[in-house]
Amino acid sequence: MRTTLHCFVLVTLVAPGLAGAQTTPWGDPDLQGIWSNQTPVPLERPAALANKPYFTETEAAEVEKNALASVLKNIASEIATSGEFNEIWLESGKGRVGRSRRTSLVADPPDGKIPFTPEGRARWEATPHLATERMTGKRLGADRPEDRALQERCITNDSMFIGGAFYNNYHQIVQAPGYLVIVSESTHDARVIPLDRRPRLGANIQQYLGDSRGWWEGQTLVVETTNFNDKRRFQGSTKDVRLIERFSRIDANTIDYRLTVTDATTFLQPWSLENTLRRRDESVFETACHEGNYGLASILAGARATEKR
């Protein structure tokens, strides 16, 4: 087996007076910083809002207020619930409705729904989701570690591509001449994105995060990602899924983000979601996942004990 190791040294220089600059010293639009994609808006539009693609300003403020109130209510509760989690780690009440005020992250098709093929929907529903049982209400298998979700096994997640998770929504963008790197808080995912139009990896090289290539269209960064492996299911997709991301800096504290997903086996048509990335002044700390990960072993051991009854 051949292992290829790429080492990149990334140095960011911030001189006095340049902190608010929108361009890097080498002339690229500056997207650097720590950004959060947390939002209370669901991926797909709820049935109750089927004919309402946008919130009003007042409604958006109410959605944000209710999301925070729900978290505060849970913190105040003295009754332990199954699967409860220290609220100090959670961000579910800190999200904002996107700049467009859409009622779903899915922006196209216009109905706010992912356009699954029958095969794609069946695959998605049968796949161990990145989300846990607490989030989905569905019991995952426990015959082997591979039955559990990728995030639960400390491998990877889709937090950059989707947003709205209840924790680990911070992403640090670092730039160097010819490269842009996105380091995600959860599971230490680091996407090194060349910007020099180099050839893609061979089709036989497939990765959890795929193979990304980026370029600038005016002030917008466009990133195309292919070469995924078949060990993950991005909304039920196959390894042939193609993702196109667009990052547009709006002001010092805001980036508009749009993702377009194409996979003819899984979706009836390409579909897109929109979210807003907002600057955060905090730091991104280490996510210790494998360290002290007693949960996975305990789940499997509990399943074996149940089988012996």
Label for each model-derived stretch:
Residues 6-17:
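Bacterial N-terminal signal peptides
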Residues 1-3:
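N-terminal secretory signal peptides that target proteins for export/translocation
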Residues 20-309:
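PEST-like low-complexity, intrinsically disordered acidic/proline/serine-rich tracts
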